[in-house]
Amino acid sequence: MIILDGKKVASRRKEELTAKISKYHNKGLRKPKLVVIMVGNDPASEVYVSHKIKVANEVGIYSELLRFDKDIKKEELYNKINELNNDQNIDGILLQLPLPIDFIEEDYLQAITPSKDVDGFHYINQGKMLQGYDTVYPCTPLGIINLLEEYNISVKNKDITLIGTSNIVGKPLGMMLLNNQATITMCNKNTKNIKNHTINADIIISATGKQFIITEDMIKKDAVIIDVGIIRDPVTNKLVGDVDFEKVKLKSSYITPVPGGVGPMTVITLMENTFVLYEKHINKSK
């Protein structure tokens, strides 16, 4: 069994990205700029945002956090996004989710111009992804693809079971895997007997946020296991995932830990996406 060490891979990619950004900056060009919008004070979002900004600063991306009270008028938030869209010195705009309950998240995600949609959630970028065109890909799905590639795990002709069909992870990841010639089975909350769909899978990717939904009896020997879930165990207070790691690892060939697997790959992919958009903006302005 080999641990898919997202923390280690992300650290190396971080060094590579820092070097790429330095080359532009040494030529006298501006640094890439990422703006993060946060509405309200969700505790988990506070942690995620502070980490994203920390990593951005470490690789040489200028980051700005715009905080808004949960009672901000919806029109005011739209206007701010539009203002950022028109700022030529901004390369990426990230809307930290979740928004307060009375905000329709999709409306604000679609308000971000596709050329600054660092999360790859705009319907134009999603449509390009669907058709297999070059575009900005959602961070967690692309991070997973990159992690598999780092360990020379091909998805071509593999039977892959994906559990969880969110717009952020499951749906885009399923499409990206299809575009890479994998055979995909997608399970949602209404799927009966998930084990029937996982037991013969070469690769299992679980993104439900439900603790230990994947157990050792549900996988075949030497399966590859990707755990996207992250939950705090109410008993031990430790972070765990969808997968019963200690037991499943004994049967799998490769497996991601929680934490230290998919999470670090998501963050570095966000930075890489910001750099991709930055390069496009810089080249366009020449």
UniProtKB/Swiss-Prot annotation:
NADP(+) binds at G164, T165, S166, I230. InterPro entries: Aminoacid_DH-like_N_sf, NAD(P)-bd_dom_sf, THF_DH/CycHdrlase, THF_DH/CycHdrlase_cat_dom, THF_DH/CycHdrlase_CS, THF_DH/CycHdrlase_NAD-bd_dom. The keyword Signal does not apply. Keywords: Amino-acid biosynthesis, Histidine biosynthesis, Hydrolase, Methionine biosynthesis, Multifunctional enzyme, NADP, One-carbon metabolism, Oxidoreductase, Purine biosynthesis. GO terms for biological process: L-histidine biosynthetic process; methionine biosynthetic process; purine nucleotide biosynthetic process; tetrahydrofolate interconversion. Its EC number is 1.5.1.5, 3.5.4.9. It holds the Pfam family THF_DHG_CYH_C. GO terms for cellular component: cytosol. Pathway: One-carbon metabolism; tetrahydrofolate interconversion. It catalyses: (6R)-5,10-methylene-5,6,7,8-tetrahydrofolate + NADP(+) = (6R)-5,10-methenyltetrahydrofolate + NADPH; (6R)-5,10-methenyltetrahydrofolate + H2O = (6R)-10-formyltetrahydrofolate + H(+). GO terms for molecular function: methenyltetrahydrofolate cyclohydrolase activity; methylenetetrahydrofolate dehydrogenase (NADP+) activity. It comes from the Bacteria. Catalyzes the oxidation of 5,10-methylenetetrahydrofolate to 5,10-methenyltetrahydrofolate and then the hydrolysis of 5,10-methenyltetrahydrofolate to 10-formyltetrahydrofolate. Homodimer. Belongs to the tetrahydrofolate dehydrogenase/cyclohydrolase family. HAMAP family: THF_DHG_CYH (MF_01576). This is Bifunctional protein FolD. It comes from Mesoplasma florum (strain ATCC 33453 / NBRC 100688 / NCTC 11704 / L1) (Acholeplasma florum). The gene is folD.
